[in-house]
Design a protein with these regions (language model features):
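C-terminal outer-membrane beta-barrel translocator/porin domains of Gram-negative envelope proteins
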Residues: 338-504, 540-545, 554-559
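Gram-negative/organellar outer-membrane beta-barrel architecture
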Residues: 151, 155-156, 172-370, 537, ...
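Sec/Tat signal peptide C-region and signal peptidase I cleavage site
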Residues: 18-22
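Membrane-embedded beta-strand positions of outer-membrane beta-barrel proteins
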Residues: 218-222, 247-251, 278-282, 326-330, ...
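Bacterial N-terminal signal peptides that target proteins for export
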Residues: 1-9
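C-terminal beta-signal and terminal closure region of outer-membrane beta-barrel proteins
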Residues: 507-561
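Bacterial N-terminal signal peptides
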Residues: 9-17
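Periplasmic polypeptide-binding modules associated with outer-membrane biogenesis and secretion
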Residues: 23-226, 250-261, 265, 411, ...
Length: 561
């Protein structure tokens, strides 16, 4: 009889474990519920100015000439016939020098259309004796690089990147834009690039780089959403050595109601001079969620996550309007999820050691009134290098191991799209979509979660999670610029968001999140940003508010530099 009773107790415990994992709000990646650092937007880290040619003197433009011969010199990179035939119809005609210059400008446009950034044609000073007209084509290139400001130990990296520009003769716009924007991948740097037009007919000019470097920075993101106040503080070092490294350490304070501890380290080093960046990331997290739907208050839950990862990213496309960044990463993750009855001591322990390879593409398109971003990733788990999973049920002094439902060889795909637009009357809109799909039951660290700023403003951070899910948000805003020293921008907005999650082992609760919100953002465009909003849940009831009461959210970010 006792054996049968124990069997039923174990089956009941297993069922309870499945229900708990299917319904608890924190079953997803716990890092998704941490405060975010949203530093004020300071503008691009790289600005470019290519100085135009000096205009011709107006008093010369009306002078008449009848060409008998055109002598075109300096053409090397474009078929000569394409240049000379532009001037042939002018032979024997009474024209002005202004018309000659207009034709030469057409040659300049031809070079620009072919992608030669510094090349141009002009009519040099001459007597036009016997109707002979000289046309000079300057195929421009950068012969020298002048670095000013505070490059520090990063100057060697800067010059190595600039060497790609000086090596391209004549300089093509694609080369120029790619490597000037590669400066922006160096940590802590702000670069202003200026290229004066060539002053000699050989086409040589100087690339002037004004560099500002922030060697250290401390930033913080503070949330008032949990409930209580929590902040993620990050200290960063940028390029103190010639390696051009960036080292940062982050910590969560205080532990808060869920007794969370989180510490992370990140180190990145540029490799070569073409934009390749390697990165090492390590983090450890521990928390005891207090809101666990479907479980009595006597059950205590403990979540642990440790992660170590290596990645390499490379800009496949990089210019002034668009970029495409490819990233390959591999990481190992250790996860523990424990449910324990505080009265009886009975417990359910789920553990996993995950080994994952992930590939990701990040695309950005920027125009005067619109910014688009698209991120796509595919991840595959492998049962190698110590990967494992286990689930233990302890009743009294007896511990029984059962099969864990999670997959170590899972496949996970995801995508995120955002678009912001600026319309007349300073009206702005923002649309964001995200989704994740997996045909497998995922380990804790691989699940997708929603709540608060993640597509559910009316809910707590990490309110719900699942193996698959999607979210969307819409926002309409209107920016005001009072121009005050400590408040450069005020942006009121209204927003709507919704999210859905799905599990292979059950139905999460809540699973259908929706909310409407009204809020305002403040920033000085340098040091701080403050986001305040009131959000009303209109989907499933939140774990902490069955009446769907409005929720006040506040997020504050600050950086020293």
């Amino acid at each position: 009889m006792k054996s049968r009773f124990d069997t039923w107790m174990m089956l009941l415990a297993i069922a309870a474990a499945g229900t708990a994992q299917a319904q608890t709000r924190a079953a997803g990646n716990p890092l998704d519920s941490l405060p975010q650092i949203n530093a004020p937007k300071k503008g691009p880290t790289v600005t470019v100015q290519v100085a135009p040619q000096a205009p011709q003197l107006q008093e010369l433009l009306s002078r008449h000439v009848t060409p008998t011969t055109f002598q075109v010199e300096g053409v090397k990179s474009v078929p000569f016939d394409e240049i000379s035939r532009r001037f042939t119809p002018l032979v024997g005609k009474d024209i002005t020098i202004g018309e000659l210059i207009e034709t030469a400008n057409g040659v300049t446009k031809l070079y620009q259309d072919r992608g030669y950034a510094l090349s141009f044609a002009f009519i040099p000073a001459q007597t036009f004796e016997n109707g002979v007209v000289r046309v000079t084509v300057v195929e421009g290139y950068v012969a020298d690089v002048k670095v000013t400001g505070k490059p520090g130990a990063m100057e060697s990296k800067i010059r190595a990147i600039a060497a790609h520009i000086t090596a391209d003769r004549p300089l093509r716009r694609a080369t120029f834009e790619r490597y000037v924007n590669t400066f922006g991948l160096l940590p802590g740097l702000t670069v202003k690039a200026n290229v004066p037009p060539p002053q000699t007919t050989d086409g040589a000019t100087t690339l002037e780089l004004a560099v500002d470097r922030k060697a250290f920075n401390i930033s913080t993101g503070i949330d008032f959403n949990h409930p209580g106040v929590q902040g993620l503080i990050t200290a960063t070092e940028n390029g103190l050595t010639s390696f051009g490294e960036q080292l940062s350490i982050s910590a969560l304070v205080p532990p808060g109601r869920d007794k969370q501890t989180y510490v992370a380290f990140s180190g990145a080093v540029p490799v070569g001079s073409s934009g390749l960046v390697t990165r090492l990331d390590a983090s450890t997290y521990r928390g005891k969620p207090t809101d666990n739907p479907g479980l009595p208050s006597t059950v205590e839950r403990t979540v642990k996550n440790e992660k170590l990862g290596l990645s390499a990213s490379y800009p496949l496309l990089l210019n002034n309007q668009r970029s495409l960044l490819g990233t390959v990463s591999g990481y190992a993750s250790h996860n523990e999820d424990r449910y324990q009855n505080k009265i009886t001591g009975n417990s359910i322990d789920t553990r996993s050691q995950v080994r994952v390879l992930q590939m990701q593409l990040d695309y950005t398109s920027v125009s005067a009134k619109q910014v688009q971003k698209l991120s796509v990733n595919v991840a595959k788990g492998f049962n190698i290098l110590g990967a494992s999973k286990s689930q233990d049920i302890t009743i009294g002094s007896d511990t029984t191991s059962v099969d864990s439902p999670i997959s170590l060889t899972f496949v996970r795909t995801g995508a995120t799209f955002t678009q912001t637009n600026e319309w007349p009357f300073k009206i702005g809109t923002s649309v964001s979509l995200t989704g994740q799909y997996s045909p497998d039951s995922l380990p804790t660290s691989e699940q997708v979660s929603f709540g608060s700023t993640r597509y559910a403003l009316g809910y707590q951070p990490g309110e719900t999670s699942g193996d698959s899910g999607w979210g969307m948000s819409l926002e309409v805003n209107r920016g005001f610029t009072p121009g005050w020293t400590y408040m450069k921008s005020i942006t009121p907005y209204i927003a709507y968001d919704m999210a859905r999650v799905y599990l292979h082992t059950g139905t999460p609760s809540p699973s259908r999140l929706s909310s409407v919100a009204i809020g305002v953002r403040f920033t000085d465009s340098r040091y701080y940003s403050l986001d305040l909003n009131i959000a009303k849940p209109v989907g499933d009831a939140p774990v902490e508010s069955a009446s769907r009461s409005p929720r006040v959210n506040a997020a504050f970010s600050y950086q020293l530099n």
